């Protein structure tokens, strides 16, 4: 009789364990999927803005927007896999790989990134520090649970097709954004030294800066050492305009000042200064994010554009 009881309880225990695992996989997959959907969607929809944030997180200058688009596509794809029960194992594997990559990147550049906003999510500010690794460790745990206990993957055709569609959509959005940014034209008129000015002719270099920013200070000092040709430099303080003259005097940058920051920043959006825009006859030739103001950059690009010797 006891043997019969033991035999009947074994399948019940096994069934209970399987049910518990399915529940753990479902909860972990949904939570991690939401995180990746929000984070990835943000990157895909605005790769140029997020690209600046990535470059500030030590991604090589110029590769931020592409990196944002690629990472965003992979994150949204991972979310799709995690939301689809039969693909949760693959979603867990890819999600875990992404989390390990993020944790490893921040750990490697920790001394440079500590205290800065990681730029992981829209609206939510999350500073790099010990807490960053704790929260990302929890996300990694979610991915490992889905990878370990998710149902076996049988076919890859549907996931491959989904990835292809997402890549096409992300690529199209990236191309549209690039064309849109390139086709922006200088507004008219712009107040320069307090007077309405037409900056739609000739070579113009817009230099956005914060007078209290050490990186802006270094960038301005470096720009002042370049041999400028016939380009006109317009310096635009993003904060504390009362210090504009002192800033230019201290950094020895020969530039005219414009306080039309709202008008110009509306046309040429960016995250944090320093930021530069090279224009010829009012049309954008190239823009320079914060990460591109580390000497000897952006001299080479300005030479190619004919702005400096």
Question: Over which residues does each language-model region extend?
Answer:
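Membrane-interface helix-boundary motifs at transmembrane edges
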Residues: 83-90, 149-159
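Short active-site neighborhood of thiol/selenol oxidoreductases, capturing the structured segment around
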Residues: 196-217, 222-226, 236
């Amino acid at each position: 009789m006891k043997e019969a009881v033991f035999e009947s309880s074994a399948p019940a225990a096994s069934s209970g364990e399987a049910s518990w695992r399915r529940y753990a996989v479902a909860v972990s997959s949904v939570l991690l999927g939401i995180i990746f959907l929000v984070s990835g969607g943000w990157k895909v929809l605005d790769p140029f803005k997020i690209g600046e944030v990535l470059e500030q997180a030590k991604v090589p200058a110029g590769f931020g927007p592409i990196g944002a688009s690629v990472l965003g596509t992979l994150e949204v794809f991972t979310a799709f896999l995690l939301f689809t029960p039969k693909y949760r194992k693959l979603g867990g594997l890819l999600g875990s790989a992404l989390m390990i990559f993020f944790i490893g990147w921040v750990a490697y550049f920790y001394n440079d990134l500590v205290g800065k906003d990681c730029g992981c999510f829209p609206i939510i500010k999350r500073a790099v520090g010990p807490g960053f690794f704790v929260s990302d460790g929890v996300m990694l745990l979610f991915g490992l649970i889905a990878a370990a206990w998710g149902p076996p993957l049988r076919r890859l055709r549907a996931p491959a097709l989904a990835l292809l569609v997402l890549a096409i959509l992300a690529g199209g959005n990236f191309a549209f954004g690039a064309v849109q940014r390139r086709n922006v034209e200088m507004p008219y008129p712009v107040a320069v030294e307090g007077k309405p000015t037409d900056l739609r002719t000739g070579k113009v270099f817009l230099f956005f800066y914060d007078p209290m920013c050490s990186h802006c200070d270094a960038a301005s000092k470096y720009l002042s050492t370049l041999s400028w040709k016939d380009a006109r430099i317009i310096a635009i303080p993003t904060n504390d305009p009362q210090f504009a003259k002192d800033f230019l005097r201290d950094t020895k940058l020969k530039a005219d000042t414009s306080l039309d920051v709202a008008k110009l920043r509306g046309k040429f959006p960016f995250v944090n200064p320093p930021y530069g825009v090279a224009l010829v006859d009012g049309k954008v030739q190239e823009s320079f994010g914060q990460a591109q103001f580390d000497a000897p950059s952006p001299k080479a690009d300005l030479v190619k554009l004919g702005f400096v010797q």
